[in-house]
């Protein structure tokens, strides 16, 4: 069935390209017109005016300015290309909503370089990595959300720094610390950016390196060796690296007791999420540049991960693509600010196919209570 639907969508994409004169009114999201249904591959004067209008709205909403007219014109061309890309993404991911985001003036290459930072190349688990025990799954709830339990801090923003790995690791440790102490504390990502240079000795180019990328398990290993993490307010995030480490052991508020890798079985992922708190995971972010909301369940998605995020929950019936029965989904906290996605969150379908590689690199961490001296 999925293959039939996929080929139907490919045909629809080609047909849409041939019906360039068809214009459907846009959708409105938080007062901002989503023009994805007004964009066609070939521009006429009216469509060009629409693109210029939406580019003006885009610049206003996201406070975008460009140093020169040449740069402005280049970004407008990129913006138009991303409108067409969002329209194609909508056809191939119909249960989500795709359109204009804060990244709509970036090429895919620029987007990956500036906002994705997972060091995934050649990834394999170290031989001494602890594996999470198999948990019972017969009594799993159909829906669960750690936000409702008070275990998740507000959405943060990594800025133009490839430090997603640090936000993923910190989010998991914030949740683990909450489970251990019943206290929700915002911890310091900047401590990891500045101070964590942990490496997997079995792999070249596997060291955590601030805005140039890292791995969540390396970050947990660093936290174990360093003794713990400081509060965000004591070591605030700047989104810059190559600065001196300002770690103060006297201000540690959360420490790692252990961490482990979770099985790629989705029931085991759900069981570990419910029992051990939010999980640090990796995902392929190719569909996230144009994502606005809904449940993303694309018919094609690479399983090569390039982005670290935080798994905080799951739902039972979030979408019904092509009139099929409603399907379950995962709830993911991202680190691109609350203006992206569903107030900073991403929903992606659950199932046996390792959607966008999200089942491959999943870690759980446990915390111990540490009082400031």
Curated annotation (Swiss-Prot):
EC number: 3.4.22.-
Expression induction or repression: By drought stress.
InterPro entries: Papain-like_cys_pep_sf (IPR038765), Pept_asp_AS (IPR025661), Pept_cys_AS (IPR000169), Peptidase_C1A (IPR013128), Peptidase_C1A_C (IPR000668), Peptidase_C1A_papain-like (IPR039417), Prot_inhib_I29 (IPR013201)
Enzyme class: hydrolase
Listed SUPFAM superfamilies: Cysteine proteinases
Active site: 164, 307, 334
Disulfide bridge positions per record: 161-211, 195-245, 301-356
Signal peptide as annotated in the record: 1-20
BP GO terms, sorted: proteolysis
Keywords: Disulfide bond, Glycoprotein, Hydrolase, Protease, Signal, Thiol protease, Vacuole, Zymogen
Top-rank taxon, per record: Eukaryota
Proregion positions: 21-139
Database matches in Pfam families: Inhibitor_I29 (PF08246), Peptidase_C1 (PF00112)
Compartments where found: Lytic vacuole
GO cellular component terms, semicolon-separated: lytic vacuole; plant-type vacuole; vacuole
UniProt GO MF annotations: cysteine-type peptidase activity
Glycosylated residue positions: 258
Membrane-spanning segments: none
Cross-referenced PANTHER family: CYSTEINE PROTEASE FAMILY C1-RELATED (PTHR12411)
Its job: Probable thiol protease.
Similarity comment: Belongs to the peptidase C1 family.
Protein name as annotated: Probable cysteine protease RD19C
Naturally occurring in which organism (per UniProt): Arabidopsis thaliana (Mouse-ear cress)
Upper taxonomic lineage: Eukaryota, Viridiplantae, Streptophyta, Embryophyta, Tracheophyta
Encoding gene per record: RD19C
